[in-house]
Amino acid sequence: MHKRLALSFPEEVLEHVFSFIQLDKDRNSVSLVCKSWYEIERWCRRKVFIGNCYAVSPATVIRRFPKVRSVELKGKPHFADFNLVPDGWGGYVYPWIEAMSSSYTWLEEIRLKRMVVTDECLELIAKSFKNFKVLVLSSCEGFSTDGLAAIAATCRNLKELDLRESDVDDVSGHWLSHFPDTYTSLVTLNISCLASEVSFSALERLVSRCPNLKSLKLNRAVPLEKLATLLQRAPQLEELGTGGYVAEVRPDVFSGLSVALSGCNKLKGLSGFWDAVPAYLPAVYSVCTRLTTLNLSYATVQSYDLVKLLSQCPKLQRLWVLDYIEDAGLEVLASTCKDLRELRVFPSEPFVMEANVGLTEQGLVSVSEGCPKLESVLYFCRQMTNAALVTIARNRPNMTRFRLCIIEPKAPDYLTLEPLDVGFGAIVEHCKDLQRLSLSGLLTDKVFEYIGTYAKKMEMLSVAFAGDSDLGMHHVLSGCDSLRKLEIRDCPFGDKALLANASKLETMRSLWMSSCSVSFGACKLLGEKMPKLNVEVIDERGPPDSRPESCPVERVFIYRTVAGPRFDMPGFVWNMDQHSSMRFSRQIITTNGL
């Protein structure tokens, strides 16, 4: 039937139909129908997403999809965001850029996350891709403003330059002046991560000559008194990240900012607010009724002033804020913002055990009751109860992402002193479409039994300081059918769960374990048993087989790959394949010889 159907349509028709299929997993399914569909999909694929840059080689991707226009790559594991991945681990993008520079000369978009990007990479991008339009560097490192200057000077069709949360070496603030005077195509510019000043005159000229600029996110070095000037040059902005605020309130600055913002009739997103002075907040009230996104995660504004601001934002769909909002502010959010989809509450003092704000579980309960469209939560707090989690689960069965971070590890239900198993069990039982879950607090193997039983659509699970034994990890790996990424730290999970579920690991993107009970011997056995997996032991104490095989390793990163062992492993990373024992023996002999 599939064969007859495939033969009944001309290739041009199928190519047109396939162009409407956006999800990678759906396109992958299409390519499996028959050989002709495989070939058509292969030649008409324009976008490629690779969640692990070591899962496949650049050459393989280029052979498989010869006409790609957009590439998205991820490098380091997610736990790198919490400094759990040692410096120098890897994630180098240069081999990809080098391969694509000769084969994808028509490439238009590159999006990178947690990768090492050098100035040489950026210069090669600028030189190789003549119609290059989009560069997104999210949480990347290794490059400087010299590399950005090469992009600015050469990429004449660039529409998007986004450096979100990247670590950039600010060699010079004049790199923006490298955009040619004839350049007018910019739509998105995010330089919020830069630490040093940029040339304001160059920034002003750039903003003035780009009529399609929709998103502008400035760094804190851009003073508030100059923001009004930029807004007057770009009243068409839809998204704005403010610069730094001045310590003293100046009436002329307040008035100028208020007037300039009132002229931005399309503005829907606000962020920045570094060192925001509460007296300046009323200047943004004129745009609040249109706001759908508000990022206050850098604003040390107290609850009283936040309440006044949020009460002006009835259309808000996404809010990022510090815990200064407190329960009272979240109650106002719940009563005002009925269209809220995403809430992230970050800690103002993450390393202080004593509560410095009035934020409890009740704030999140209020939002779950008042915001019927809420589907994504990241919530840092210092206390939680099973009853609150059960209420949240029943209020919001539409939740797809739930990440709860209790500041103190292994904190129980503070009212009953019981583990939080029942509460998280309710989350996975009631939220049928849950895709991402982060656990915290006192948890036993029972919660993992709940997860394995109910979380059938969960794709990513993050676990820390939880569980009793290997049984907990076994419940997850054997029960969660859709699991792609599992990251674990400081848990008693070890060899039995790892080896018993070896075949499950081949269906996942990756497993990260640090400070657990996994032995070097188990890692070596897994590597020998599963050739399609890269089992990487990360141990800064020296070669792992210089210690007994029963000795736990510091970290292990396991991922599915069709590329085999990588070639850029530093001295503290060892790949456990069938030849590992021989290599280790030679390494020890060589080291001893020295």
Region spans (language model):
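N-terminal Skp1-binding subsegment of the F-box domain
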Residues: 1-33
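C-terminal capping region of solenoid repeat domains
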Residues: 80-83, 94-99, 171, 175-185, ...
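Short helix-loop-helix/strand-helix junction enriched in hydrophobic and basic residues
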Residues: 11, 26-44, 56, 65-66
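A generic tandem-repeat structural signature
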Residues: 89, 96-196
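Short, conserved beta-strand segments within well-ordered enzyme catalytic domains
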Residues: 47-51, 70-74, 109-113, 136, ...
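F-box-proximal linker/hinge
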Residues: 24, 39, 49-108, 120
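Acidic/glycine-enriched edge-of-secondary-structure segments
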Residues: 44-49, 377
